[in-house]
Regions:
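Electron-transfer interface patches adjacent to heme c in soluble/periplasmic c-type cytochromes
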Residues: 1-110
């Protein structure tokens, strides 16, 4: 099972599509206008080559990479309610409580 886990976590991300399409360009402009980029960070840099570990296994090919995930991969405390809408679903997933949401990566959407 560890091999499957390693494989799944090492898969490449989908390529961005239709980057010159006017509708995609408008969507990107709206993304910044709505300040989505404050949580959905466009560009991140991985740790130096040779320092990326997964379950104690070095993954040198994942180091020194520039990625465009449109996420910060963090858990955010969304509170129990925002503007009168209850966001706490009481669903525990891993270490995340029901009021914590991970910023979903938007890579490959275009």
């Amino acid at each position: 099972m560890e091999d499957v886990d390693l494989y799944m976590q090492s898969l490449g991300v989908p390529a961005r599509r239709n980057v010159n399409d006017p509708q995609v360009i408008r969507g990107e402009q709206n993304f910044y206008k709505a300040k989505c980029h404050l949580c959905h960070v466009t560009t991140l840099h991985t740790k130096p080559r040779g320092s990326v570990l997964l379950n104690g296994t070095r993954l040198p090919w994942l180091g020194s990479q520039t990625i465009h995930p449109y996420s910060d991969f963090l858990l955010h405390d969304m509170g129990s309610e925002i503007m009168g809408v209850g966001l706490n679903d009481n669903y525990v997933s891993g270490l995340a409580r029901g009021n914590e949401w991970r910023t979903t990566p938007l890579w490959g959407i275009g």
